[in-house]
Design a protein with these regions (language model features):
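Carbohydrate-associated surface elements
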Residues: 69, 192, 213
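N-terminal subdomain of nucleotide-sugar transferases
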Residues: 2-4, 8-77
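Short alpha-helical donor nucleotide-sugar binding micro-motif in glycosyltransferases
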Residues: 180, 292-293, 300-305
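Aromatic "clamp/platform" in nucleotide-sugar-dependent glycosyltransferases that forms part
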Residues: 313
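Conserved donor-binding/catalytic core segment of Leloir-type glycosyltransferases
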Residues: 31, 223-250, 263
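Short hydrophobic beta-strand element within catalytic cores of glycosyltransferases
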Residues: 330-333, 343
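Conserved acidic donor-binding segment of nucleotide-sugar-dependent glycosyltransferases
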Residues: 344-346, 350-357, 366-371
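Nucleotide-sugar donor phosphate/pyrophosphate-binding loop at the beta->alpha transition
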Residues: 44-47, 147-150, 158-178, 216
Length: 407
């Protein structure tokens, strides 16, 4: 434990608050606490946290990132892809029973280091990602050091009681309620997420919706106007992502489109079952499971594909939809998820009812046979991202909110 404290103390001071090469010194210094952040070996993990930070300095905000990981998990290493971040490992109880008190353990690991950092380089605000454990630790730090804090809510389970059951789940819910009530603002990535927070908070919560963004330069349209004949999905291979539904829909559609194939980027516990399903549906030869890929590989695949489909039934927003839209592709997504606040059906994307096989078959059939419609939707999708969902847009919204909270 002493070695951990010494190491993390050194890391925090080594990071400091870097002002980069620009001459204009930002007026505001923000400490970001996050359980997910990109590394050189996994540049997709937490990209939705890292990418807006690159634009924050333009809006007078400088961020110091502390990415955290429990001691009992495999270390992510120290290969953060940006010099403003360091990984810190903290002790906690493994399993669901350990999630509720994890923020207190994290606070205990951080308080002395953050206090010294605050004394030497004033921290104006703490921004935590997810209520547990980072939000809880941020609220405790906020109270101890008299620094305002905000918490971003990234998913549709803001109280963690859907993923953790029984007594432990109820404990998680109560701690999360405390976090949302105590934070200066609960930042929600969609209105749907905000509604879930308000419905479950059991007391007034100050929420603000700030949508995630997309790096529109990385996820740019293809130079060539001759895409490959593939339908693409990007997502973990877990039931809620809808890969099974899409395989069954493609089994019905592909006989009418003999040149079309299906590519899936992602990995997870459903891999073997989905592979067997593709074989059972007699489309195994036209389905490629590509596994995890880098951000560049994902962007290249999106540029190459004919259209993007992910009939996920449980998405707070879904950054992959914005990324595909930014590459000028028609996107198929589900109603009732965060993305339907951005997609206008038939205009800049295509929406189906969750779990509706016939709806998905119809959507695929319409879009695969209509080049002009795909092109119109893709162009509108790209305009949508450029007009409202770039990293600069998100950074500007965050900077405005930060200043409201410290005023």
């Amino acid at each position: 434990m002493q070695e951990l404290v010494a190491s993390t103390q050194s890391d925090l001071h080594k990071v400091g608050f870097r002002f980069g090469e620009k001459t204009r010194q930002p007026a505001m210094q923000v400490l970001t606490l996050t359980p997910f952040y990109p590394t050189a070996s996994d540049d997709a993990n937490g990209c939705f946290v890292a990418e807006p930070l690159r634009a924050m300095e333009e809006f007078g905000v400088n961020s110091c990132v502390v990415a955290v990981q429990p001691l009992h998990r495999i270390s992510p290493g120290s290969d953060a892809i940006t010099p403003i971040a360091r990984w810190i490992r903290y002790p906690c109880i493994p399993g669901g029973i350990g999630l509720a008190p994890a923020g207190a353990f994290l606070y205990a690991s951080l308080i002395s280091k953050v206090r010294r950092l605050h004394q030497s380089r004033r921290i104006d605000l703490i921004h935590a990602h997810a209520a547990l454990p980072c939000g809880h630790a941020a609220v405790l730090l906020s109270r101890e050091l008299n620094i305002p804090c905000v918490v971003t809510v990234h998913g549709l389970d803001p109280f963690f009681d859907k993923q953790v059951h029984g007594f432990a789940g109820e404990w998680c819910k109560r701690v999360a309620q405390f976090v949302y009530r105590s934070a200066s603002r609960a930042i929600c990535i969609s209105q749907k997420v905000a509604e879930n927070v308000i419905d479950g908070a059991a007391a007034p919560v100050n929420t603000t919706v700030i949508y995630n963004s997309v790096d529109t330069r990385m996820f740019s349209p293809a130079v060539s106007d001759t895409p490959s004949r593939t339908v693409l999905s990007v997502g973990n291979l877990i039931p809620i992502k809808g890969h099974e539904l899409l395989l069954r829909a493609l089994a019905a559609v592909l006989p009418h489109f003999p040149e079309i194939s299906y590519e899936i980027i992602g990995d997870g516990p459903e891999h073997q079952r989905l592979t067997r399903l593709a074989s059972d549906c007699n489309i195994a030869g036209r389905v490629r499971f590509l596994g995890r890929q880098s951000r560049k590989q994902v962007a290249d695949a999106m540029r190459r594909c004919l259209l993007f489909a992910l009939p996920s039934r449980y998405e707070g927003l879904g950054c992959v939809y914005l990324e595909a839209m930014s590459t000028e592709k028609a996107v198929i997504a589900c109603r009732g998820q965060g993305i339907d606040e951005i997609i206008r059906h038939g205009s800049n994307g295509w929406l189906i009812d969750p779990g509706n096989l016939q709806d998905l078959i119809a959507a695929l059939s319409v879009l695969l046979q209509n080049l002009q419609l795909r092109r119109q939707i893709g162009e509108a999708a790209r305009r949508t991202t450029l007009q409202s969902f770039t990293s600069a847009h998100q950074a500007a919204h965050l900077a405005t909110l930060y200043r409201e909270c410290v005023a």
